[in-house]
């Protein structure tokens, strides 16, 4: 028996009945009294029930010193490596949910033209600050906008790639958001996606305490099959999917062990938190290498119109 809790909740995505997964422990609020995670019996997508009040991503901790910046940049670069290798210098990349701007900066430093959108005003300002020391010639736009405003931002332009790095799990309207991103990509354009892997060894090991659940902000919870289905429904064909990318999800291991060092929840712990995450790279990389890492990284290609 999976759980004694009732299975009456309907999936908000496909409308099918669901089954109970677990009751998570929120990293900021402790064990919630009524929140539970369920998964559709048809589309397989997991979801937080009831829906979180605040689906915005937690503010990312900006690197505060040279050592921390180098470490954070290396982690981001490793995660994006599979996508960047498939692009040509000068290609346009849309960073959806740019946060503090570190990912957009890494892409710009590699010679791509970057259009970074971020709906949170404070994060948008931090992203602008992140770009202030870019070398001459770097091409990057930072715009305060959500996914639904992306067509207006692009104003008829198309991109060769888009990045949704830990964004899908926050979207109010999952399929509509993916469809909007697909609409600004050129035929054959690439989409790079990263989401927490709910079937990972880390999720099983930490159970309700796993950092990747984040029930106060994550509406959706994916495994490989459900992510494939969702992308396919928005006319993306998956070119590569799995946990074998970059260094895995070391922060998921680190902050599940020591939530007090999570810089998103406890500002001022950035260097210590990232140092712990770096120390967890061998653990995360081992899980990644055998296909059970905490982060699913996907490269998908947009179908021709």
Protein language model features and the residues they cover:
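Conserved N-terminal segment of class I S-adenosyl-L-methionine
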Residues: 2-165, 175-179, 243-244, 266, ...
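Conserved catalytic loop of SAM-dependent methyltransferase domains
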Residues: 27-29, 239-266
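Short glycine/proline- and charge-enriched loop/turn segments
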Residues: 60-67, 206-215, 254-264
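Short catalytic micro-motifs in class I SAM-dependent methyltransferases
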Residues: 165-172, 194
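Short N-terminal helix/helix-N-cap motif within the alpha/beta-hydrolase-1
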Residues: 172-176, 203
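A short glycine-rich, Lys/Arg-flanked "PGG" loop and its adjoining helix->strand segment in the class I
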Residues: 175-190
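Short, glycine-/aromatic-enriched active-site segment of Class I SAM-dependent methyltransferases
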Residues: 193-220, 225-230
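Conserved Class I S-adenosyl-L-methionine
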Residues: 281-300
